[in-house]
Swiss-Prot record:
Protein name per its UniProtKB record: T-complex protein 1 subunit theta
Organism annotation: Arabidopsis thaliana
Subunit structure: Heterooligomeric complex of about 850 to 900 kDa that forms two stacked rings, 12 to 16 nm in diameter. Interacts with CCT3, KNAT1, STM and TTG1.
UniProt-listed NCBIfam families: chap_CCT_theta
Entry comment describing in which tissues the protein is expressed: Expressed in shoot meristems, root tip, vasculature and leaf epidermis.
Classification via Pfam families: Cpn60_TCP1 (PF00118)
Keywords, sorted A to Z: ATP-binding, Chaperone, Cytoplasm, Nucleotide-binding
Function description: Molecular chaperone; assists the folding of proteins upon ATP hydrolysis. Known to play a role, in vitro, in the folding of actin and tubulin. Contributes to stem cell maintenance through its impact on transcription factors trafficking through plasmodesmata. Probably involved in refolding translocated, partially unfolded proteins, including viral movement proteins.
Domain of life: Eukaryota
Similarity field: Belongs to the TCP-1 chaperonin family.
Molecular-function GO term, any one: protein folding chaperone
Length: 549
């Protein structure tokens, strides 16, 4: 009888043992909203130029000190399924534009927080979703009206125009150093910009991080910087043709074992000589083809190196196949699988290739000053690895912003001017609506206020005063009034030159709204019992006993 009374009931009777089932407003919807709010609370304090850094130590004990939201959420290993939706939205934003991940997460969190208030007032989630959907369409319409006139066309090779659009994205990561970084990134991007700018490839701008010095010691190399020394004694070549061998520079040996029967000392001597002659013949053929530099993707035999020295050929080893591909792009070479005589069209060319020492690190620099090469390297200098990693993220943001502006160069006012204008116009739109949608549209409009509030809070200013001043200015028709964080007052963005890309705002707004509506549409969560077996990594397994909940 006891066994009968303990049998599962309802949906549990249908599922396997260990399943968890959550349903209803309180258990599913509100819990999901709370998880998303927690995530947005983490990233929100990192928004804007005065944003705080987060110190994240991942499961491999790697330390991250950054205010880049995309990096933070990537390394947090979030388990909650609803919060994961926001992470996916941020990743989509990062891949599409390369900037605005924080805006996406924080805005989605704010939308959900306001939705929770409406749910507690008695509105049904479907009514909120309907209102939010209308608000998104209207917001996109308003955003297009706020585009700065004349920004539809730009010369992507004009340094000043590019920097004006890139400054805000880089300043949000490295405030105070944006001028140096923007200048470096712009030069690097313009060098490798193809004839059709929409085909710009972010992989063509590389970053090489070298410890020591400071950011002001950073420079740009038109070509590649390899963190390795040349093999052999030849360390420099000018105007050299390059032969690339992916499989290594060594005598080829068969995979099966060969046995040789030798009767006399002469035969032994001749056997060694034939091997030597074979290697010399191959190296001589490479030298006669005009190549002064050999780049190997594998091992370099001692005998081969000896003959390379004799024929005055510089030898480099690049173990990474990705680096080898980039080197081929830099030099315009075609990689051969094994050591053989290269044809003239397969040879690459570099203006100079030399081994240099920068800050105690030996690097090989391959330069190609003439046009036509497609790789540019930003050499970053800094005192610690964490600083260099963060500088690299700022450079990546700058390069991605350049790619975005090559496709769509339109700009909108930054410094929270766009958000306040959107909030104000959406509130007017909501007042004209009839039905329950108006409450959701009003809350959607209020959600935009988190941007000026967060920017002011992070800069230590009085948020309420700033927002009130912004609303007053925008109400009197000044659509470009934003926050000047340095002076702690409201100022026209035409003076402060803070512009954001239209595409960044548009995609952040769309992705955040989609993520928020997706979370609100969920009314039941059914979770299987986690599969047994080893954890995903040893670090988790070690701490599993302590973490088991």
């Amino acid at each position: 009888m006891v066994g009968m009374s303990m049998q599962p009931y309802g949906i549990q009777s249908m599922l396997k043992e260990g399943y968890r089932h959550l349903s209803g407003l309180d258990e599913a919807v509100i819990k999901n909203i709370e998880a998303c709010k927690e995530l947005s609370t983490i990233t929100r304090t990192s928004l804007g130029p005065n944003g705080m850094n987060k110190m994240v130590i991942n499961h491999l004990d790697k330390l991250f000190v950054t205010n880049d939201a995309a990096t933070i959420v990537n390394e947090l290993e979030i388990q909650h399924p609803a919060a994961k939706l926001l992470v996916l939205a941020a990743k989509a934003q990062q891949e599409e534009i390369g900037d605005g991940a924080n805006l996406t997460i924080s805005f989605a969190g704010e939308l959900l927080q306001n939705a929770e208030e409406l749910i507690r007032m008695g509105l049904h989630p479907s009514e909120i979703i309907s209102g939010y959907t209308k608000a998104v369409s209207k917001a996109v319409e308003i955003l297009e009206q706020l585009v700065e006139t004349g920004s539809e066309t730009m010369d992507v090779r004009n340094k000043d125009e590019v920097i004006s659009r890139m400054r805000a994205a880089v300043a949000s990561k490295q405030f105070g150093q944006e001028e140096i970084i923007c200048s470096l990134v712009t030069d690097a991007c313009i060098q490798v910009c193809p004839k059709n700018p929409t085909n710009f490839n972010v992989d063509n701008v590389r970053v090489s991080k070298l410890l020591g010095g400071g950011l002001h010691n950073s420079c740009i190399v038109r070509g590649m910087v390899l963190k390795s020394d040349a093999v052999g004694s030849i360390k420099r070549m000018e105007k050299a043709k390059v032969a690339v061998f992916a499989g290594g520079v060594d005598t080829t040996a068969t995979e099966t074992k060969g046995t040789v029967l030798i009767h006399s000392a002469e035969q032994l001597e001749n056997y060694a000589k034939t091997e030597e002659a074979k290697v010399e013949e191959l190296i001589k053929a490479v030298a006669e083809s005009g190549a002064k530099v050999i780049v190997s993707g594998g091992s370099i035999g001692e005998m081969a190196l000896h003959f390379c020295e004799r024929y005055k050929i510089m030898v480099l080893k690049i173990s990474s196949k990705f680096e080898l591909r980039r080197f081929c792009r830099t030099a315009g070479a075609v990689a051969h699988l094994k050591l053989s005589r290269p044809s003239p069209e397969d040879l690459g060319y570099v203006d100079s290739i030399s081994v240099e020492e920068i800050g105690g690190v030996t690097v090989t620099i391959a330069r190609n000053e003439e046009g036509g090469n497609s790789i540019s390297t930003v050499v970053l200098r800094g005192s610690t690895d964490s600083i260099l990693d963060d500088l690299e993220r700022a450079v990546d943001d700058g390069v991605n912003t350049y790619k975005a502006m090559c496709r769509d160069s339109r700009i909108v006012p930054g410094a929270a001017a766009t958000e306040i204008e959107l909030a104000q116009r959406l509130k007017e739109y909501a007042n004209a609506e009839i039905g329950l949608d108006k409450y959701a549209i009003t809350k959607y409009a209020e959600s935009f206020e988190f941007v000026p509030k967060t920017l002011a809070d992070n800069a230590g200013l009085n948020a309420m005063e700033i927002i009130a001043a912004l609303y007053t200015g925008h109400g009197s028709g000044n659509t470009k009034l934003g926050i000047d964080l340095e002076e702690g007052a409201c100022k026209d963005v035409s003076e402060t030159k803070v512009w954001d890309l239209f595409a960044t705002k548009l995609f952040a707004l769309k992705y955040a709204s989609d993520a928020a509506c997706t979370v609100l549409r969920v009314d039941q969560i059914i979770m299987a019992k986690p599969a047994g077996g080893p954890r995903r990594d040893a670090a988790q397994a070690a701490g599993a006993g302590a973490e088991e909940d």
